C-alpha cells in the first residue's frame, strides 16, 4: 500500500490559491493514481468501507483540481444505491461526478459517508466545498466518466481497497 502523502503534482498555484490551501489543515489522503492506457486508474483504500468510498471520491476530484484550494463554504448530499458493492461504488462516483460536471459545478474539499446499508447497497454521503471556478481552482484533467472496466473491490480484510478506472 502506498504511503499517505500530500498530492505532489504541480498545479502551478497562484499566491491566492496557496493562501487558501494554507488556511485549512490537509485532508488525509489514502489514494494514488496508476497509469492505464488512455485513462487513469484510481487506487483508494481505507480502514473502513466508508473511508475507502470517501478516499475514492476524493481521488477522482483530486485528479481534476488541487482539492486543497477548495473552501468548505457549503454542503451537498449524495444518496445512491446499487445491486452490489461494485455497482454501489460506480453509482456513488457517478453521482458525485454529476454534481461537479452537469449540475452544480460543486467541488468538495472533503467527502464523508454518513451511512452504508450493506444489505440493500444504499449509501448516504455529504461533501463540504464550493462551486468550481477556474479563477480560484487550478485546472487538472477533466474526468469524463466512471467505468466498470477492471473495477475491483476488496473488502474481506483491512484495509478496504478499491481500483476504479476513470475515463479522461
Curated annotation (Swiss-Prot):
The modification N-acetylalanine is found at residue 2. Keywords: Acetylation, Calcium, Metal-binding, tRNA processing. GO terms for biological process: tRNA splicing, via endonucleolytic cleavage and ligation. InterPro entries: Archease, Archease_dom, Archease_dom_sf. Ca(2+) binds at residues 39, 167-168. It holds the Pfam family Archease. The keyword Metal-binding applies. The keyword tRNA processing applies. GO terms for cellular component: tRNA-splicing ligase complex. One of its GO terms (molecular function) is metal ion binding. Transmembrane segments: none annotated. Component of the tRNA-splicing ligase complex required to facilitate the enzymatic turnover of catalytic subunit RTCB. Together with DDX1, acts by facilitating the guanylylation of RTCB, a key intermediate step in tRNA ligation. Component of the tRNA-splicing ligase complex. Belongs to the archease family. PANTHER family: ARCHEASE, PROTEIN ARCHEASE. This is Protein archease. It comes from Mus musculus. The gene is Zbtb8os.
Amino acid at each position: 500500500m502506498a504511503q499517505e502523502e500530500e498530492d505532489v503534482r504541480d498545479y502551478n498555484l497562484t499566491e491566492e490559491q496557496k493562501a487558501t490551501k494554507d488556511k485549512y489543515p490537509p485532508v488525509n489522503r489514502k489514494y494514488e493514481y496508476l497509469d492505464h492506457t488512455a485513462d487513469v486508474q484510481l487506487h483508494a483504500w481505507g480502514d473502513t468501507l466508508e473511508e475507502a468510498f470517501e478516499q475514492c471520491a476524493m481521488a477522482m476530484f483530486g485528479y481534476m483540481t488541487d482539492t486543497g484550494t477548495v473552501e468548505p463554504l457549503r454542503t451537498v448530499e449524495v444518496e445512491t444505491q446499487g445491486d452490489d458493492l461494485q455497482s454501489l461504488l460506480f453509482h456513488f462516483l457517478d453521482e458525485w461526478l454529476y454534481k461537479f460536471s452537469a449540475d452544480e459545478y460543486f467541488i468538495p474539499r472533503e467527502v464523508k459517508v454518513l451511512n452504508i446499508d450493506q444489505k440493500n447497497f444504499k449509501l448516504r454521503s455529504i461533501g463540504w466545498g464550493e462551486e468550481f471556478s477556474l479563477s480560484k481552482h487550478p485546472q487538472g484533467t477533466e474526468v469524463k466518466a466512471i467505468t466498470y472496466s477492471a473495477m475491483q473491490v476488496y473488502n474481506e480484510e483491512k484495509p478496504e481497497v478499491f481500483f476504479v478506472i476513470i475515463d479522461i
